Amino acid sequence: MHQTITEKIFSDHVGREVFANEIIESGIDMVIGNDITTPISIKQFERSGATKLANPEGFCIVMDHYIPAKDILSANQAKISRDFAYKHDLKYFFDEKDMGIEHALLPEKGLIVPGDVIIGADSHTCTHGALGAFSTGMGSTDLAYAMITGKNWFKVPPTIKVVFRGKLGRHVYGKDLILEIIRQIGVDGARYKALEFCGETIDALDMDGRFSMCNMAIEAGGKSGIIAVDETTREFLKGKNLRAEPKFFYSDEGAGYERVLEIYADKLDPVIAYPFLPSNGKSVREAVKDDIAIDQAFIGSCTNGRLSDLRIAAEILKGRKVSRKTRLIITPATQKIALAAQKEGLMDIFVEAGAVVSNPTCGACLGGYMGILGAGERCVSTTNRNFVGRMGDRTSEVYLANSAVAAASAIAGKIADPREL
């Protein structure tokens, strides 16, 4: 029978053909924890009586949410993960010396391999589907079970196929494509579904844009986001010391999709998601008419903190200044990205424009630190969520946008169209 990519990946891991809605137990290729979620998993691991990881080379911890520690509580929390990593001589443990946001760092390190089944105790683990893997977020207890057994149970998700047609316009990126999908289907429109992205627009999209799209599949309720491997993927993987041999899977002609959507990308403007849902999308043309003053702009996160995002921001900011009443915070997603930006002279542009550049961290995105919003403040952010209190005070507001819109808005002191600067 004809299968989707997701069904083929699970069939490969189970050893027989499986299809949507089947309950299965599958081996896990990579289990991902971070400084927030792993301590809970460690507690459950030790409570079970386990003394060894089922697959030490298939488990990693990335310290990224509160690193360097912002207070005593986060320092003690980080210590639990560090102690566990050193006790078990964990091969893939990434701390301050090699820091980065997990969903940017792990592909960079070659730990995400096409054809993998990946779970992480972080909802944006779906990012890694951009490399042709099945990747999804789970809770810390599920993570502990995988640490102990090397397996976990799944219901094979049905797939929604999203076909993009046409060429992207100026300052329209992968972020706008995923915001448009969420605008159309809502925050639960893909609940427990795999979102499979394809079409000539995706064929022409760079890896950074693909990561942004798969990252936000969860914001439509998706179990995963996935894009088939092509020449762009292979080019990204070239030269990386991959953890394992990749396997390339492609959906069959006639595969059973629950739904097929078609979106004409050449008709899209940059999209801005208003508070308090990622589905509250408007075109930037509409948003500019609303004349919304902002207090802060943020460029970073596992959605849009990659090198292309920093280049886009630098192009907008070069020779300009951040508005007097507006703060601009820029957070590269990894140390490697930060170093590349420095070598390209992007850091000089940011500082000269009046931006603050932080170390790689999830920080501001989750309202953790280094960019928390005060009462009534508004922020244009390249992050992925904008619910009540997401980035700070419960009365603050977050408008989700791409890097060009965020940079242009920082200059204007209000939501702005980068194409009009």
Curated annotation (Swiss-Prot):
Print the organism lineage: Bacteria, Pseudomonadati, Campylobacterota, Epsilonproteobacteria, Campylobacterales
The protein's annotated catalytic reaction(s) are: (2R,3S)-3-isopropylmalate = (2S)-2-isopropylmalate
The Swiss-Prot or TrEMBL record lists the needed cofactor(s) as: [4Fe-4S] cluster
Quote the cofactor binding remark: Binds 1 [4Fe-4S] cluster per subunit.
State the pathway, as annotated in the record.
Answer: Amino-acid biosynthesis; L-leucine biosynthesis; L-leucine from 3-methyl-2-oxobutanoate: step 2/4
* Quaternary data: Heterodimer of LeuC and LeuD.
Species of provenance = Campylobacter curvus (strain 525.92)
Q: What does this protein do?
A: Catalyzes the isomerization between 2-isopropylmalate and 3-isopropylmalate, via the formation of 2-isopropylmaleate.
- Cite the EC number: 4.2.1.33
**Gene for this chain:** leuC
Q: Which GO terms describe its molecular function?
A: 3-isopropylmalate dehydratase activity; 4 iron, 4 sulfur cluster binding; metal ion binding
Protein's name in the database = 3-isopropylmalate dehydratase large subunit
Q: Which residues are recorded as binding [4Fe-4S] cluster?
A: C302, C362, C365
Assigned keywords, A-Z: 4Fe-4S, Amino-acid biosynthesis, Branched-chain amino acid biosynthesis, Iron, Iron-sulfur, Leucine biosynthesis, Lyase, Metal-binding
